[in-house]
């Protein structure tokens, strides 16, 4: 084995001494760290006057049109003492006495003619009274269900501000019982059942119930309103007489309000239906919501569109929008929980459904 020549061997390094700097107490930071951290400002006091501008005087909020603003929520009218109701009850009782005396005299006369006629009249009277009792019980049950919906809504509003989880669970159970007849709420009921042992405060539990139970019902309610508005718009556009328009609009409104009440568990009878219709129209009369907003009217009839549309078609669109507004008011009254976790629908949400009817270039025309 041959050795490497001496001139090619590496020179050994001689020992040397080095001075080590003492480590600093804080670790070194990269040069860009100071740029990333915001500089803290020492607290100061300001003597400038702060003026709060009310919403009514705010120029950025004053320009909102009626359609962009939040529509008023329909609420049931307060029950007050009325002399008209008192007079109606008094004359109704008097008429009942008169009918009772007439029936008594009739049965007595039938017994004087023949016994079998008297017994037949008594049997018919018993059948009639039994049927009347069933009708009265159904009407009272319908009114009770409507009152229960409003009671649940008031309890939910109070518990959303201040309430315990146990009270909120009782409220959610009442809402489940009210809507269990609808197959759309099956998934929501299973979600709420799975969350029974979870720790949830009252407002969030009510919001969860609204999203899981009422969201599918709200979608169904929207479809009911859209279909009713379309039918009213088309019938108004093709009907030959204004009386036909009015009759069909009233028929469609009554059917829409009844379907809305049955959807949310109200299921009113005839008397309860009249009461619900009175609350709906009272809300629309007080708020002036039957008339559409300037922005929406300009969208439907403005920009030269009125000159290209027939008068009947314009009336059909307006009646369809009015039907949609009535449907929204009925939705507010029949819904067991107010719109908080979910967005409340507005008239603008139903405009796309009526757009084929107001578009002059549409094939529907």
Curated annotation (Swiss-Prot):
Q: What top-level branch of life does the organism fall under?
A: Bacteria
Q: How does it sit in the membrane?
A: Multi-pass membrane protein
Span-the-membrane segments of this chain are 83-103, 117-137
Record region (Disordered)? 1-47
Q: Name the GO cellular-component terms.
A: plasma membrane
Which terms are listed as keywords in the entry?
Cell inner membrane, Cell membrane, Membrane, Transmembrane, Transmembrane helix
Mind telling me which NCBIfam families this protein's record contains?
hyp_HI0043 (TIGR01620)
Similarity-based family: Belongs to the UPF0283 family.
Question: What is the protein name given in its UniProt record?
Answer: UPF0283 membrane protein Avi_2471
Which species does this protein come from?
Answer: Allorhizobium ampelinum (strain ATCC BAA-846 / DSM 112012 / S4)
Task: Show the taxonomic lineage.
Answer: Bacteria, Pseudomonadati, Pseudomonadota, Alphaproteobacteria, Hyphomicrobiales
């Amino acid at each position: 084995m041959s050795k490497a020549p001496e001139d090619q061997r590496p020179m050994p390094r001689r020992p040397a001494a080095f001075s080590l700097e003492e480590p600093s107490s804080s670790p070194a930071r990269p040069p860009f760290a100071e740029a990333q951290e915001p500089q803290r400002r020492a607290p100061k006091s300001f003597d400038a006057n702060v003026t709060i501008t009310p919403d009514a005087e705010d120029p950025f909020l004053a320009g909102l049109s009626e359609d962009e603003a939040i529509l008023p929520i329909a609420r049931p009218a307060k029950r007050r003492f009325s002399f008209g109701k008192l007079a109606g009850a008094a004359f109704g009782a008097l008429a009942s006495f008169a009918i009772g005396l007439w029936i008594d005299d009739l049965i007595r006369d039938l017994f004087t003619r023949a016994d079998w006629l008297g017994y037949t009249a008594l049997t018919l009277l018993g059948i009639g009274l039994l049927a009347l009792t069933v009708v009265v019980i159904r009407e009272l049950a319908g009114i009770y269900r409507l009152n229960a919906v409003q009671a649940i809504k008031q309890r939910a509003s109070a518990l959303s501000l201040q309430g315990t989880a146990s009270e909120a669970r009782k409220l959610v159970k009442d809402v489940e019982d009210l809507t269990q007849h609808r197959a759309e709420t099956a998934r929501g009921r299973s979600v709420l059942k799975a969350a029974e042992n979870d720790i949830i405060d009252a407002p969030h539990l009510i919001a969860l119930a609204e999203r899981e139970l009422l969201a599918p019902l709200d979608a169904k309610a929207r479809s009911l309103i859209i279909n009713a508005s379309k039918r009213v718009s088309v019938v108004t556009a093709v009907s030959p007489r204004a009386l036909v328009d009015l009759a069909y609009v009233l028929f469609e409104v009554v059917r829409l309000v009844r379907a809305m009440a049955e959807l949310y568990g109200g299921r009113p009878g005839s008397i309860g239906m009249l009461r619900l219709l009175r609350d709906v129209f009272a809300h629309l009369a007080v708020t002036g919501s039957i008339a559409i907003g300037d922005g929406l009217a300009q969208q439907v009839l403005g920009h030269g569109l009125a000159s290209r549309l027939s008068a009947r078609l314009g009336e059909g669109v307006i009646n369809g929008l009015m039907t949609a507004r009535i449907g929204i008011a009925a939705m507010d009254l029949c819904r067991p929980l107010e719109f908080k976790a979910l967005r409340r629908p507005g008239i603008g949400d139903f405009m796309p459904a009526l757009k084929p009817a107001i578009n002059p270039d549409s094939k529907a025309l």
